[in-house]
Amino acid sequence: MTPEELLHAFARTRASLDGEETVFWWTGDVHSWAPGEPYRRLFGFEGLNAARLEADEEGGGYRMLSREAAFYLDPATREILETWQDKPVVHVWNDPANQRWRPFPVPRTELGDQVCFSLEIPLAYPSPLPVADYPLNSADDTYRALELFQFFTPAAALAGDAPSVPATMSWTRMSPWLPWMEQGQRPGGLTFHCRGVKLASYAEVPESTRAYIAARHPEFARAPEKWTEPNESSWTYFRRLNPR
């Protein structure tokens, strides 16, 4: 397959070619690691991404306009946390979380009657939270993380011509301690391990999660209507809440 064909297939799996909104919902856990310490399951994690595609005439691919919200949960009860070790929890409110896709050889693996698209995204860039300004909240002046995605779809669905195909996903993320955890430069960090599904509509998001979003940021039920920059992240959102 050409890079253009691979991107076309991936776009149908990740979103919808007709510009209709798609919602991915995921659930999982967040584990800590640190030298000399056992691995610990600190949080449950649940979230969603509402997205829509539009053609990127300039780049010859697509622009994905999206928002994503995600929540840290009590690992036992799976209730959304408001505090952790007497510190306020800052949940994920990334608006926007846009992507620009240009044709590239998207890794594709046939797994029986399924097709898997894999994305490995190493990140390293100047931290929005310099240690000098945020000594309790920042692990380093360089933000480093690793995002690992797998999107699965039935091969038979992909062989058709529908603009969107059913999909499930897995996501693993290795990152520094979260800013609100106030771990400073302590060695170690977090591993997120989640699985998810493309929903038929936002109405399929668990009711308690929809209620939480509706009471705080109802706009996260929909994808953005227009392209904006820059993207929001947990680090930039924390800086916005806590300017220095």
Spans of model-derived segments:
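Long terminal segments
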Residues: 107-244
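N-terminal segment immediately downstream of the Sec signal-peptide cleavage site
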Residues: 1-72, 207-244
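Intrinsic disorder/low-complexity segments enriched in polar/charged and small flexible residues
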Residues: 27-28, 35, 86, 95, ...
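Short, low-complexity intrinsically disordered segments
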Residues: 23-24, 31, 82, 91, ...
